[in-house]
From Swiss-Prot:
PANTHER family found in the cross-reference section: DNA REPAIR PROTEIN COMPLEMENTING XP-G CELLS-RELATED, DNA REPAIR PROTEIN RAD2
Primary localization: nucleus
Role according to the record: Single-stranded DNA endonuclease involved in excision repair of DNA damaged with UV light, bulky adducts, or cross-linking agents. Essential for the incision step of excision-repair.
UniProt-annotated binding residues for Mg(2+) 1: 30, 77, 777, 779
Cofactor binding annotation: Binds 2 magnesium ions per subunit. They probably participate in the reaction catalyzed by the enzyme. May bind an additional third magnesium ion after substrate binding.
GO cellular component: nucleus
Species per Swiss-Prot/TrEMBL record: Schizosaccharomyces pombe (strain 972 / ATCC 24843) (Fission yeast)
Protein name, entry field: DNA repair protein rad13
Annotated localization: Nucleus
Residue numbers spanned by region N-domain: 1-95
Keyword terms, alphabetized: DNA damage, DNA repair, Endonuclease, Hydrolase, Magnesium, Metal-binding, Nuclease, Nucleus
Cofactor section: Mg(2+)
Family designation: Belongs to the XPG/RAD2 endonuclease family. XPG subfamily.
Gene Ontology molecular-function annotations: DNA endonuclease activity; metal ion binding; single-stranded DNA binding; single-stranded DNA endodeoxyribonuclease activity
Length: 1112
């Protein structure tokens, strides 16, 4: 570890050195810190330690040192000092916390991922809910006053809704949770007791083959009383034993049966016994039971294996020919057809198309009614229609032909219907399968909404209750007219297509016909309508006025249109103008009557007989619609409306035509017993044109609003997407932080073991490199080796080496750069006036292997504290001053500098230990336990074979991979040993000054505050690093005690000049003149030793030393 942040302080004094200049240098290497680095740094992605990473790291670094010709000496840590053991214990406590924190972090990771999954699930649920709500809102709501009796159609619909196609890959639910699976109490796995009991059950069973079956009477009552399993086992074992030779060899059998005939008789007896046992087994298993058994099958033929009852026995294969004459002829009668249809229907009902769960929705009442109507239509027109599946697949042309044909047939039926009398009418009514529509009060605005209901089908919008099984009309007497109308369930020309159950929300707002300009024009009073193009036949009775104090309550229409009406739905480009216009007045119930114009259909029938059909109304394809007229009724009467069916076909309109033009000759002949009025109406082109102009303006306004709504929708989606991206980014960032924290906690939890140290030492022995184990600290031993000149430098990344007295340290030797960082203690003294004792003081503040340091104190603040409190007792003075601040007894003078003000703000955060500063820390650094032996080191030759085997055993490297790295290094070593290397010029300058060959680079401080702290520390004269005696004597002689670099450099230059000259009096005078020039211009009478500063120790006895050396 070293001193925290010390490398940052010493970085300005580093020198770059090339690796090529370190040839034949003896370098002491701290091996313990290498192992520590490999343990902490070399890990996998999950933060786990890689196996044998320390061996691989040592091998690579050793090869690099040997390649550059460096002679390393490895030093391992020994026993730790007491102070370090205390620090290690504290760190172990922290390491235990790290292990616990690693578990906590893993739980946090799991919780974060689970929370993320829950957020995604919740977001998906919100989107599904929003989608469902949007689809529900886009659907038109039915009035609350309308009720529906769905007692008949509910079971069928529920059957379709509840049925889901089974997923072949969906596994059944388990009775046991996943937590119990694979555990010791997993019910699928036998426990230890059960396994022991199961094994013991087999060990207790005696081998049945050991018994003698020759004396067993298989027909005895005792044998027959045995269980079937035992009898079968005994018979099987006896039969198998009969095939053996009793375990005797051929020689033994020859001795037992010297006569070959006796041996043959013995074999025949064994054969008879085996056959008897085989027959008993066949009888026991039922194989001998008589009866035919089929062995093969072919059309019109039957193969039967029959047992032969004759004396010859055996089995015979018989063939029975199934010719057509012998086969029965199946007659398809009505009962058979009916039963087959029922079976087919049952088989068809077994499977249904089920919508996707994510897009499905509950069926609203409108869809329930549509389903019921579809069922009624199938029952009513079963002979003229095909099945649903065939109907879904027919083409448009076929639909057109069917619709035209049925409309012609219904035209004929309608003519016959009008020719019937009232009694015949009632009789026909009782025989037809019809249904009842119970209508309630419905606003007129909602009635127009029924015209545009679906993309493909215009369904029945507002209907009443559907009756039960009888599906008959309920008769109701009207108080005013007392008439009943025959209304059919559906127009026979209309054919309902298969609708899509998956109703997606529209990307635009649905058209509200109640608010359109078209419908506003339709809501004019009755008088306006009567004054315009409306003709009421004179045959209509007075009590049957169509428009008299009434409102339009219900328009029931079922229309099947093609996809060419899609444009008319959102854009109102093809409005449907009903011939029935609403009358705004008091709300009253109205009767439904149906217009059935006859003359156009007669013409259509005649044209159809000729082969051509001409639409008198300019209609398109098979689009048909039933229009029901309303007659007034008493408002108080809320009973059911009895409707009798009159088949009619609505004149349909072209989608290309903007309006509906109804000819005036479309009139309904009034019947005396009907009491209904026929209505033929037409709209003037000018009125329609005016309506269309206003409609286009309304459409433009709506499209502009739709554009604005779309922009708002897109912006909301983008904002939501950005929010989701931000949430995802935050999640990824948090996940990355937790993973890094988990890796660091795993790294801090591991520690160096003795096995790692032994493997590294074995590798060094195989390389022939010397290594030693220090008594205590490896850094201290390296410093001692450098002091004894057994090595030329120290290679370590531990800054404690300077505190132990290391003066030449190499750092970052194995990085990618070609330069190594060299730190010299002389540079520290010259540049920053820092010595070993100052570094130890920094260790008290920053923390090291021997002390924990002070919290909230960094390298810059530590330098400022040492500058503010200098001297040997500086740290003690700092402690007293800080205690005054903590207790609140500090005066204003105690906080009179920027540094003290800064420290005053950290009073509650900095905690001083009671033993601070601990003098034992100084003693441990100044006087460590080291080996003082001066025995020189020897370097050997690597053992290639042993290295291969060692790397194979520890790392798993093959011989080829080891040779790829090791052979070039060994070859280069031999080449340098025998050929030699060229000497460089720098080795001749390593006498007194060893720094000339490693020039320093100008350093730019990253922190201005650090630069100021080092500068202030540099200008201060340290009491622990006194000037040399000669410099001090010169300062005493001239009445000034400057410890600055300028004074020292000038005096040293002068002394070199003096030493190069011969001793003479003139030289003495010149020296005196030179020294006088250094003296400040002050009064000579004022210069005395007493006037010098106290902090400088003056020694006048050294004034004559230069002259004495000169005389010698």
């Amino acid at each position: 570890m070293g001193v925290s942040g010390l490398w940052d302080i010493l970085e300005p004094v580093k020198r770059p050195v090339k690796l090529e200049t370190l040839v034949n240098k003896r370098l002491a290497i701290d091996a313990s810190i290498w192992i520590y680095q490999f343990l902490k740094a070399v890990r996998d992605k999950e933060g786990n330690q890689l196996k044998s990473s320390h061996v691989v790291g040592f091998f690579r670094r050793i090869c690099k040192l040997l390649f550059f010709g460096i002679k390393p000496v490895f030093v391992f840590d020994g026993g730790a000092p007491s102070l370090k053991r205390q620090t290690i214990q504290k760190r172990q406590a922290r390491r235990l916390d790290r292990e616990e924190n690693a578990t906590v972090t893993a739980n946090k990771l799991l919780a974060l991922q689970m929370r993320h999954q829950a957020m995604l699930l919740e977001e998906n649920n919100k989107k599904a809910t929003a989608l469902a709500n949007a689809s529900v809102q886009n659907e038109r709501q039915m009035p609350s006053s309308m009720t529906l009796d769905n007692s008949e159609i509910k079971p069928v619909l529920n059957q379709r809704k509840n049925y889901l196609k089974p997923d072949p890959y969906q596994l059944p639910e388990m009775d046991v949770s996943f937590d119990k699976l694979g555990s010791s109490y997993d019910p699928r796995i036998m426990s230890q007791d059960e396994l022991t009991q199961y094994v013991s059950s087999f060990t207790k069973i005696e081998d049945i083959n050991l018994f003698d079956f020759s004396n067993i009477d298989f027909d005895s009552e005792l044998f027959q009383s045995l269980p079937d399993t035992d009898k079968y086992s005994i018979l099987s074992a006896a039969r198998l034993r009969s095939r053996l030779r009793m375990g005797l060899s051929s020689e033994q059998l020859s001795e037992m049966f010297p006569n070959r005939m006796d041996f043959s008789r013995f074999q025949i007896e064994r054969l008879k016994e085996r056959n008897d046992l085989t027959q008993r087994l066949m009888d026991f298993t039922g194989m001998n039971e008589f009866g035919p058994s089929r062995v093969v099958s072919e059309k019109n033929r039957e193969y039967i294996l029959v047992k032969n009852e004759g004396a010859e026995g055996g089995w015979a294969l018989g063939v029975i020919s199934g010719s057509t004459n012998n086969e029965p002829i199946i007659i398809d009668d009505e009962a058979t057809k009916l039963s087959s249809n029922l079976i087919d229907e049952d088989e068809d009902e077994a499977f249904y198309d089920v919508p996707l769960p994510s897009r499905s929705h509950s069926m609203n009442p409108r869809e329930l009614v549509a389903a019921k109507l579809k069922e009624i239509k199938e029952n009513s027109f079963s002979e003229n229609q095909q099945s649903d599946e065939a109907d879904y697949n027919v083409t448009d042309d076929l639909i057109l032909q069917l619709a035209t044909q049925q409309s012609l047939e219904e035209n004929k039926k309608s003519k016959e219907l009008f020719s019937l009398s009232a009694s015949e009418f009632d009789k026909l009514n009782s025989e037809k399968k019809t249904f009842e529509i119970l209508s309630t009060d419905i606003p007129a605005e909602d009635s127009m909404n029924s015209l545009l209901n679906d993309e493909e089908n215009l369904k029945l919008e507002h209907v009443g209750d559907v009756s039960n099984d009888s599906l008959a009309f309920a008769e109701k007497k009207h108080p005013e007219n007392g008439t009943s109308i025959f209304m059919d369930a559906l127009p026979s020309a209309s054919r309902e297509k298969k609708t899509n159950d998956l109703i997606d929300p529209l990307p635009f707002q649905p058209m509200d016909w109640g608010k359109s300009i078209f419908f506003e024009k339709l809501k004019k009073p009755t008088e306006t309508f009567m004054d315009s193009k409306t003709d009421i036949p004179s045959e209509a009775p007075d009590n049957s006025k169509l428009v008299e104090d009434t409102n339009l309550h219900t328009i029931n229409a079922t229309v099947n249109i093609e996809s060419d009406l899609d444009a008319a739905k959102p854009g109102i480009e093809n409005p449907i103008i009903s011939p029935l216009l609403p009358v705004k007045d008091d709300e009253k119930d109205l009767d439904l009557r149906e217009l059935n114009p006859l003359e156009p259909f007669e013409n259509m029938k005649e044209q159809a007989d000729d082969g051509t059909v001409t639409n008198p109304l300019n209609v398109s394809s098979d689009k048909a619609m039933s229009v029901y007229l309303l007659s007034s009724e008493n408002a108080k009467d809320t009973g059911d409306i009895k409707s009798e069916s009159i088949d009619a076909v609505l004149p349909t309109l072209e989608t290309s035509s903007p309006s509906l033009s109804i000819p005036t000759d479309f009139q309904k002949e009034a019947s005396p017993n009907k009491g209904a009025a026929a209505l033929s109406s037409k709209v003037e082109p000018e009125v329609v044109e005016k309506l269309l102009d206003e409609e286009e303006e309304e459409m433009i306004i709506r499209m502009a609003e739709e554009e604005k709504e779309y922009d708002r929708f897109v912006s909301e989606l983008n904002q939501r997407h950005e929010t989701e991206e931000w949430n995802q980014e935050a999640f990824e960032k948090r996940l990355k932080e937790l993973k890094n924290q988990k890796r660091s906690e795993k790294r801090d939890a591991d520690e160096v073991t003795q096995v790692m140290i032994k493997e590294c030492q074995e590798l060094l022995r195989l390389f022939g490199l010397p290594y030693i184990v220090a008594p205590q600290e490896a850094e201290a031993q390296c410093s001692k080796l450098l002091e004894l000149k057994l090595v030329d430098g120290i290679v370590t990344d531990d800054s404690d080496v300077f505190l132990f007295g290391g003066t030449r340290v190499y750092r970052n030797m194995f990085n990618q750069n070609k330069f190594v960082e060299l730190y010299l203690m002389d540079d520290m003294k010259r540049e920053f006036n820092v010595n070993q004792m100052d570094l130890i003081k920094l260790a008290h503040l920053l923390g090291s292997d021997y002390t924990m340091g002070l919290s909230r104190v960094g390298p810059v603040l530590a330098l400022e504290i040492l500058h503010e409190f200098p001297g040997d007792t500086g740290l003690f003075e700092f402690k007293k001053w800080f205690q005054r601040l903590s207790t609140g007894h500090a005066s204003k003078n105690d906080v009179n500098t920027p540094v003290k003000k800064r420290i005053n703000k950290l009073v509650g955060k900095i905690i001083l230990p009671s033993e601070f500063p601990n003098p034992l820390v100084d003693e441990a650094y100044l006087h460590p336990a080291v080996d003082d032996s001066k025995q020189s080191f020897q370097w050997g030759i690597p053992d290639l074979d042993e290295l291969r085997q060692f790397l194979m055993a520890t790392v798993g490297w093959s011989k080829q991979r080891t040779n790829e790295v090791l052979l070039p290094v060994i070859q280069d070593m031999h080449k340098k040993q025998f050929v030699g290397t060229q000497s460089n010029l720098t080795q001749f300058f390593e006498g007194g000054n060893t720094n000339v060959y490693a020039p320093r680079v100008a350093y730019h401080f990253k922190s201005k505050r650090l630069e100021n702290a080092l500068s202030s520390f540099k200008n201060q004269i340290s009491n622990q690093s006194p000037m040399s005696e000669e410099i001090q004597a010169d300062a005493d002689a001239f009445g000034e005690s400057k410890g600055s670099d300028e004074l020292q450099s000038r005096i040293l230059r002068r002394k070199k000049m003096m030493a190069s000259k011969n001793s003479s009096d003139s030289d003495s005078d010149s020296e005196d003149n030179f020294l006088a020039s250094l003296t400040p211009k002050t009064n000579s009478s004022s210069i005395s030793i007493e006037n010098l500063p106290r902090k400088t120790k003056l020694s006048t006895s050294l004034l004559k030393k230069p002259s004495k050396r000169r005389r010698k």
